[in-house]
């Protein structure tokens, strides 16, 4: 039986926990103290609720972050300096170049592992392969409903209540998108990490009142040729900012743990 530590206890974390494959159990959940009573109740005291990785006296087989960019920044180094493998869904945290460098250095020094999950997008294996031959351009476009953009910087850039058709409200780099939209733009960061990097990856964000799905379009050109991917995914019912596929990518990470581990 493989035992994981979960960072987070929000909508995505709970979705992942409800879908853990056979052979994987959760031993620890790192979350704010306000969630600890709910964790104890949900798991009958069989799962240890933590506020910091230091409180874990055993070694998890995998630490799975399903919380936020802030959680990656706050706890990531503490995890990898213990030599624990850390899988992150909030990849936008790595738009902070200093944080990314610290995490990579800690992994080298302490035999840790930083695993970038694919999240809500497909084709990252092909993108990373294409990078080996040289990339000319990588462009990512995300289109979501007004509900998916509420509570984000989008509210300062466009009137979400008045929009009547699909409209672009942001164009810029993946680094800018990850910084301005920390709960919405992890896909942009994931694409950047597998492709041209945070500054050269171009991002366009749209709102469409007619859609109920999160649509991701990726266009890649390079010496290999070119490819385009379009993925129209359902958001989590419990959190419209989060794509169901992102949660499933975390579940699949757990399955890989059982089936023979990760290829980094």
Curated annotation (Swiss-Prot):
GO molecular function: aspartate dehydrogenase activity; NAD binding; NADP binding; oxidoreductase activity, acting on the CH-NH2 group of donors, NAD or NADP as acceptor
Keyword ATP-binding: no
GO BP: NAD biosynthetic process
SUPFAM superfamilies reported for this sequence: Glyceraldehyde-3-phosphate dehydrogenase-like, C-terminal domain, NAD(P)-binding Rossmann-fold domains
Reaction(s) catalysed (UniProt annotation): L-aspartate + NADP(+) + H2O = oxaloacetate + NH4(+) + NADPH + H(+); L-aspartate + NAD(+) + H2O = oxaloacetate + NH4(+) + NADH + H(+)
Enzyme Commission number(s) from the entry: 1.4.1.21
Enzyme's top EC category: oxidoreductase
The keyword Oxidoreductase is annotated on this UniProt entry: yes
Binding of NAD(+), residues: 120, 186
Entries under Gene3D superfamilies matching the protein: Dihydrodipicolinate Reductase, domain 2, NAD(P)-binding Rossmann-like Domain
Protein family per UniProt: Belongs to the L-aspartate dehydrogenase family.
Protein name (record): L-aspartate dehydrogenase
């Amino acid at each position: 039986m493989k035992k994981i530590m979960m960072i987070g206890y929000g909508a995505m974390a709970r979705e992942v926990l409800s879908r853990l494959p056979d052979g994987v159990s959760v031993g620890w959940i790192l979350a704010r103290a306000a969630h600890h009573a709910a964790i104890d109740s949900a798991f009958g005291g069989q799962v240890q609720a933590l506020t910091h990785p230091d409180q874990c006296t055993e070694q998890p087989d995998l630490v799975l972050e399903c919380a936020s960019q802030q959680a990656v920044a706050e706890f990531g180094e503490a995890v990898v300096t213990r030599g624990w493998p850390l899988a992150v869904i909030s990849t936008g945290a790595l738009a902070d170049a200093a944080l990314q460098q610290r995490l990579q250095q800690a992994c080298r020094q302490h035999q840790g592992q930083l695993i970038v999950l694919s999240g809500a997008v497909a084709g990252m294996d092909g993108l990373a392969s294409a990078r080996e031959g040289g990339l000319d351009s990588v462009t990512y476009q995300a289109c979501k409903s007004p509900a998916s953009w509420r509570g984000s910087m989008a509210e300062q850039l466009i009137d979400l209540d008045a929009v009547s058709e699909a409209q672009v409200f942001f164009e810029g780099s993946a680094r800018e998108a990850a910084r301005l939209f920390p709960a919405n733009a992890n896909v942009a960061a994931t694409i950047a990490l597998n492709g041209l990097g945070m500054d050269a990856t171009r991002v366009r964000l749209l709102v469409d009142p007619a859609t109920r799905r999160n649509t991701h379009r990726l266009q890649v050109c390079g010496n290999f040729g070119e490819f385009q991917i379009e993925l129209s995914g359902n958001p989590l019912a419990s959190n419209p900012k989060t794509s169901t596929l992102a949660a499933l990518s975390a579940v699949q990470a757990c399955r890989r743990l059982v089936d023979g581990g990760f290829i980094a």
